[in-house]
A protein has these predicted regions:
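Generic protein-terminus/edge-of-domain signal
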Residues: 1-79, 137-139
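Amphipathic alpha-helical segments enriched in hydrophobic/aromatic residues interleaved with Lys/Arg
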Residues: 4, 8, 12-13, 136-193
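Short hydrophobic beta-strand segments that form the core of ligand-binding sensory/regulatory domains
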Residues: 71, 81, 96, 106, ...
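Short acidic-glycine-tyrosine-enriched beta hairpin
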Residues: 86-101, 109-111, 115
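Ligand-binding loop in jelly-roll beta-barrel domains
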Residues: 102-133
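Short, Lys/Arg-enriched, Trp-marked, Pro/Gly-tolerant hinge/linker segments that flank
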Residues: 157-162, 179-192, 199-238, 242
C-alpha cells in the first residue's frame, strides 16, 4: 500500500487518544444506541452514503458484537486477531475478511503499527458486484445473496489470504484511496471496482476460508470427528443420536 495512505491511516484518532490516556474500553455510544452490541451503520455512514472506510480502532479490546451492515476488513500492515463465531481469525498484511450481518465478532487489542481499514458497506452497494459475477454457484455468491436478502446464511464470513495477488491488492487500495480521500463521482466507480474485486477473488477460491454460525461449525466438527472415529462401523442413526 502507498506509504502516504499508510501514514494517514496510522494517525492517532480522537477515540484512540482517549484510550491511550487511560480509557480501558470502547465507548459503545460511538457505535450504537441499542442495549445489545449491534454496530449501527447510521453511526458510521453519512446520510445517503452506501460505503465508507475508517481505520480500525487500536489499543483496546472490542467486545463481541454484530453489525447491521456488511463489514470488510483489509489488513494494511501488521496483524489483528479476531474471534468470529467462536473461531480465531488472525489477519496478516494483505488479508481480507468479509463479515455479514449474522457474524459475531470480537477483536483483541491491536498495536500502533497494526493498521487495518474497515469498509462499512450497505448491502445494496453490492448490487453491481452481484450482477458482474454471473450465474455460477459458489460461496462468494452465496455470501452475497445472504447479505443482500438478509438471510441467516451458514456462510457468515469469508477470509481471503491474498497478500501475494497483485490485482486484488491494487483493487482494494484503489477503493480505500478514492473513499478515504472522498474523490468525486466515486460511487459507480467503486461499485464496479468491488465487482472487479469479486471477479478476481473467484480465481483464488483456494485461498479462501469460510465460516458459518458457531452452532453449524461445531456440528460439522463433531460430524468429522465421528466419521474419523467410526469410519468402519458408524451409522447415520448412531450419529443422529450423538448429535
Amino acid at each position: 500500500m502507498h506509504q502516504e495512505l499508510i501514514r494517514e491511516l496510522a494517525m492517532i484518532t480522537d477515540e484512540e487518544r482517549r484510550i491511550l490516556e487511560g480509557k480501558q474500553e470502547i465507548d459503545p455510544q460511538l457505535y450504537t444506541e441499542k442495549k445489545e452490541m449491534v454496530v449501527d451503520s447510521a453511526k458510521l455512514l453519512k446520510k445517503g452514503k452506501l460505503i465508507q472506510v475508517r481505520p480500525h480502532t487500536r489499543f483496546v479490546h472490542f467486545p463481541a458484537h454484530t453489525h447491521n451492515y456488511i463489514e470488510v476488513i483489509y489488513m494494511c500492515q501488521g496483524t489483528t486477531t479476531h474471534i468470529v463465531n467462536g473461531n480465531q481469525v488472525v489477519l496478516e498484511q494483505g488479508d481480507l475478511l468479509f463479515l455479514n450481518q449474522n457474524a459475531v465478532q470480537e477483536i483483541l487489542p491491536a498495536g500502533e503499527y497494526d493498521i487495518a481499514v474497515n469498509f462499512i458497506v450497505l448491502p445494496e452497494f453490492f448490487n453491481t458486484a452481484f450482477s458482474m459475477i454471473g450465474a455460477e454457484e459458489n460461496q462468494l455468491k452465496d455470501f452475497l445473496v445472504g447479505a443482500l436478502c438478509g438471510r441467516d446464511e451458514e456462510t457468515s464470513y469469508l477470509y481471503f489470504h491474498v497478500a501475494d495477488i497483485l490485482p486484488v491488492q491494487n483493487l482494494i487500495e484503489n477503493m480505500v484511496w478514492t473513499i478515504f480521500y472522498d474523490i468525486s463521482n466515486k460511487r459507480s466507480s467503486n461499485q464496479i471496482t468491488m465487482g472487479l474485486l469479486f471477479l478476481q477473488l473467484l480465481n483464488y477460491m483456494d485461498k479462501m476460508e469460510a465460516g458459518g454460525r458457531k452452532f453449524d461449525t461445531e456440528i460439522m466438527a463433531n460430524v468429522y470427528r465421528y466419521i474419523e472415529d467410526h469410519f468402519k462401523e458408524g451409522t447415520l442413526s448412531e450419529l443422529a443420536v450423538e448429535m
